[in-house]
Amino acid sequence: MDYSKTLNLPTTEFPMRANLPQREPEIGRFWDEIEVYQLVQAKNAGRPKFILHDGPPYANGHIHLGTSLNKILKDIVVKFKSMDGYNAPYVPGWDTHGLPIEQQAIKQLKIKRSALSPVEFRRMCREYALKFVDIQRAEFKRLGVRGEWHNPYLTLQPHFETRQIEVFGEMAKRGYIYKGLKSVYWCADCETALAEAEVEYAEKESPSIHVAFPVVNGRGLLPDQDAAIVIWTTTPWTIPSNVAICVHPEYAYVLLRSGGRAYLVARDLAGNFRELLGDPGAGVEREYRGEELEGVVCRHPFVERDSVVVLADYVTLEQGTGCVHIAPGHGEEDFALGQRYNLPVISPINGKGYFTAEAGNLDGIFYLDANPVVVRELEARGALVGYSRMRHQYPHCWRCKHPVFYRATEQWFASIDGFRRHLLEAIDRVQWIPGWGRDRIRGMVAGRGDWCISRQRVWGVPIPIFYCGDCGRAVITDETISHLKGLFAEHGSDVWYAWEAAELVPPGLVCPHCRGRGDFTKELDTMDVWFDSGSSHWAVLTQPDYWPDLQWPADMYLEGSDQHRGWFNSSLTTAVAVTGEPPYRAVLTHGFVVDEQGRKMSKSLGNVIEPMEVLKELGADILRLWVCSADYRGDLAVSPGILKQMSEAYRKIRNTFRFLLGNLQDFDPDRDTVAYTELTELDRYALLKLHRVTDRVLRAYREYEFHQVYHTLYNYCVTDLSAFYLNVIKDRLYCEPARSVNRRGAQTVLYAVLDSLVRLLVPVLAYTTEEVWGHFPANGKKPPSVQLLEMPEPNPEYLDDELERRWERLLAVRQDVLRALEAARQEKLIRDALEAEAVLYAEPELLEFLRENTVQLPVIFVTSSVRVLPAAEAGGEEAVSGTVAGLKVAVRRAPGTKCVRCWTYGETGVDPEHPEICPRCATVLSGLNL
């Protein structure tokens, strides 16, 4: 007889092979068909809101691993919150203006910018941006991210732009917007001013020069004939714009005599300077305190201009000479110092980075190419004291990656000083995750200068300012902003370029400054794109006509740590300026994606991993599992090897689901559930472990400790389930009568485990949990999608401290037995545990404990028999000590013969009709009416 046909073997259509790259798109289409986002929102209507406001990615190019990481983290948060008692809408957004889109539109559409009108060029930029919105939307959806994809926010939408100029107008009304000449970051390649947030530092090689400025009026302190003050700089091209030399008022300075000339440098740097001169014996003629030197006049090395000594506390002694060359036209600190001393601002470089005629013989030379020209001129004049090359961190444009420089131009600014104190106070009212984010953004806000918000570009939101034709002053009032909001809402911001100023101003506009009604002109600069995205809290969260589920402020912003200086900062600035409050209650930041060696992803290093390629090869759930597994507070390492490890971890989780489903194929929870009080001790312990795991995972989700979610659930599947509970109940599941309380009790636990496990993993394994839900035992109340479920609640009924202590002790004994069984396998004494009899020799207290639990031991050891004997009877037998004190374990061949149905060894042949099976199996068969 084929006894295998009498067993309750697991059966399920849930496939062993995941085949995620093929199966996931099918599930994605299913979500679209049932409109799962709308179903979730309907289910959660009326609940407390949790608003995660999406930081808009740039609509330029395909998504990369960094944007994938960010979107998956957001999806984990939103999905969990929507299953944890909240109404958690998610409206994705895109940043759609700015120079990179201009450049790519020109490149890909093969158009000539100068041949197009601003309106035509803006139309092409819009088409390009919208194309990549569609591309990225499909890619984000493929990651399994749920959201209001049919109704995202775009910074180019008229209803967004109207709110943006409303924010601008309100800031202007409060006196925070002004136009002024300042030294700002400038990108020659992009031909525009940059904000601090648009600058990143990268290593660059530069010339390092020491330059002597001859003293012409030493004010009785320094010789007027043969003395010079020595400055050090890595930007020789700024020397033509020098107007002053700065020293620290409290530092000591010395006059060194060498080769018939006297040089002034900081005392603490004199040793280095002697080495530079090659004159270690250069003597000190006199020492000065920095503040004494104020007003000393030097002559510019090759320009007919004086250079006066000024004082500032920011001078350091880290390198150089302690004497700093000052060019207010080419440095933020220089400019501020120049304002204090009323110094001239010289900035003879145009927007493309070329010197103008004002620079004399440098006219027409690109500023970086001017370095060797300046060095040669200094050398010819005898002013070059030292020259070398050095590598150092230098500011670069984060869009085009070219070096940037400071250039004094007239720009529009937001005055941070006007409300800096309010910004710092607002920061303290926000929860920062991790906590160090608070100090980081406080430092940035405390030290930042005014925000340069104007850009010399066309593709952007125009700065909504007119100029009076009579007095020339800027005009921005409630009336002009209100009128423009109506025009922008109806026509979009293109109207600014399509219409003349006379058509844009409100009818009968009167200049508030001179009461003139003359011809008005319009500002041609656009707003910094950080003002676009920085206004999104107001443009998106306060527009119920477009996004009725949202509200202000957001509960959370979640972005990479670089956004402390970017979106977090710009959003905070506009919100506090307009409302006095931060736009977010909490800010969560994550690190960057790096390779196994901690290096950034780079094509030159060949370590770039494209997310869409991962999806094609492994599936989105593998990427999502990787995101969850890593501690996002630091940089996140990824490589093909790491993704392979995640695939293996996923396989183990999937196999756990498959085992659970396979053994619940005949289980109806409404009909077959066994009451807790009727369950075996083993089953009650399994439910206790489930309670602990559920509680731990829910706390980890709520505290945004997602890596703890992963590690807890993975270890639960592998250790608590696969290696223990699921293994030891196989005999009950397969061999006991199908409807017996013993088997139904085990199934009751399996159902509870499956029900909790699938819910707990929905935010992480979006596709797989949906697939599991499709095979879930039906009980007539099953919603169409797993995403419509709630998180499981830990069941306090399962808590039993005494049971837990007892079973933790039993499992410790089990570990010693498993080690002894493995040793017996290695020695070829047995092939598997059912061929064994475990003999436990125990000291009195442990002996009593084990005898009290004798019935459990063969089950949890998965051996055919177990004997428990006093330690004194161990004798000379090969009994091995383990980790449990007072215990030795010996393994023998189990007595009896093998039951061909359940494979345990013992008595067989009791039933003459079934001579090869054990009495238990014979009893089961008798009830089957074979």
From Swiss-Prot:
<keyword id="KW-0436">Ligase</keyword>
<feature type="binding site">
    <location>
        <position position="603"/>
    </location>
    <ligand>
        <name>ATP</name>
    </ligand>
</feature>
<dbReference type="GO" id="GO:0006428">
    <property type="term" value="P:isoleucyl-tRNA aminoacylation"/>
</dbReference>
<dbReference type="Pfam" id="PF08264">
    <property type="entry name" value="Anticodon_1"/>
</dbReference>
<comment type="subunit">
    <text>Monomer.</text>
</comment>
<dbReference type="InterPro" id="IPR009080">
    <property type="entry name" value="tRNAsynth_Ia_anticodon-bd"/>
</dbReference>
<dbReference type="GO" id="GO:0000049">
    <property type="term" value="F:tRNA binding"/>
</dbReference>
<dbReference type="InterPro" id="IPR014729">
    <property type="entry name" value="Rossmann-like_a/b/a_fold"/>
</dbReference>
<dbReference type="Pfam" id="PF00133">
    <property type="entry name" value="tRNA-synt_1"/>
</dbReference>
<feature type="binding site">
    <location>
        <position position="902"/>
    </location>
    <ligand>
        <name>Zn(2+)</name>
    </ligand>
</feature>
<dbReference type="InterPro" id="IPR010663">
    <property type="entry name" value="Znf_FPG/IleRS"/>
</dbReference>
<feature type="binding site">
    <location>
        <position position="559"/>
    </location>
    <ligand>
        <name>L-isoleucyl-5'-AMP</name>
    </ligand>
</feature>
<dbReference type="InterPro" id="IPR002300">
    <property type="entry name" value="aa-tRNA-synth_Ia"/>
</dbReference>
<comment type="similarity">
    <text>Belongs to the class-I aminoacyl-tRNA synthetase family. IleS type 1 subfamily.</text>
</comment>
<dbReference type="InterPro" id="IPR001412">
    <property type="entry name" value="aa-tRNA-synth_I_CS"/>
</dbReference>
<dbReference type="InterPro" id="IPR033708">
    <property type="entry name" value="Anticodon_Ile_BEm"/>
</dbReference>
<comment type="function">
    <text>Catalyzes the attachment of isoleucine to tRNA(Ile). As IleRS can inadvertently accommodate and process structurally similar amino acids such as valine, to avoid such errors it has two additional distinct tRNA(Ile)-dependent editing activities. One activity is designated as 'pretransfer' editing and involves the hydrolysis of activated Val-AMP. The other activity is designated 'posttransfer' editing and involves deacylation of mischarged Val-tRNA(Ile).</text>
</comment>
<keyword id="KW-0648">Protein biosynthesis</keyword>
<keyword id="KW-0862">Zinc</keyword>
<keyword id="KW-0963">Cytoplasm</keyword>
<keyword id="KW-0030">Aminoacyl-tRNA synthetase</keyword>
<dbReference type="InterPro" id="IPR009008">
    <property type="entry name" value="Val/Leu/Ile-tRNA-synth_edit"/>
</dbReference>
<dbReference type="GO" id="GO:0005524">
    <property type="term" value="F:ATP binding"/>
</dbReference>
<dbReference type="InterPro" id="IPR013155">
    <property type="entry name" value="M/V/L/I-tRNA-synth_anticd-bd"/>
</dbReference>
<dbReference type="GO" id="GO:0002161">
    <property type="term" value="F:aminoacyl-tRNA deacylase activity"/>
</dbReference>
<feature type="short sequence motif" description="'KMSKS' region">
    <location>
        <begin position="600"/>
        <end position="604"/>
    </location>
</feature>
<keyword id="KW-0479">Metal-binding</keyword>
<protein>
    <recommendedName>
        <fullName>Isoleucine--tRNA ligase</fullName>
        <ecNumber>6.1.1.5</ecNumber>
    </recommendedName>
</protein>
<keyword id="KW-0067">ATP-binding</keyword>
<feature type="binding site">
    <location>
        <position position="899"/>
    </location>
    <ligand>
        <name>Zn(2+)</name>
    </ligand>
</feature>
<dbReference type="GO" id="GO:0004822">
    <property type="term" value="F:isoleucine-tRNA ligase activity"/>
</dbReference>
<dbReference type="Pfam" id="PF06827">
    <property type="entry name" value="zf-FPG_IleRS"/>
</dbReference>
<feature type="binding site">
    <location>
        <position position="918"/>
    </location>
    <ligand>
        <name>Zn(2+)</name>
    </ligand>
</feature>
<feature type="short sequence motif" description="'HIGH' region">
    <location>
        <begin position="57"/>
        <end position="67"/>
    </location>
</feature>
<dbReference type="InterPro" id="IPR023585">
    <property type="entry name" value="Ile-tRNA-ligase_type1"/>
</dbReference>
<dbReference type="GO" id="GO:0005829">
    <property type="term" value="C:cytosol"/>
</dbReference>
<keyword id="KW-0547">Nucleotide-binding</keyword>
<dbReference type="GO" id="GO:0008270">
    <property type="term" value="F:zinc ion binding"/>
</dbReference>
<dbReference type="InterPro" id="IPR002301">
    <property type="entry name" value="Ile-tRNA-ligase"/>
</dbReference>
<dbReference type="InterPro" id="IPR050081">
    <property type="entry name" value="Ile-tRNA_ligase"/>
</dbReference>
<feature type="binding site">
    <location>
        <position position="921"/>
    </location>
    <ligand>
        <name>Zn(2+)</name>
    </ligand>
</feature>
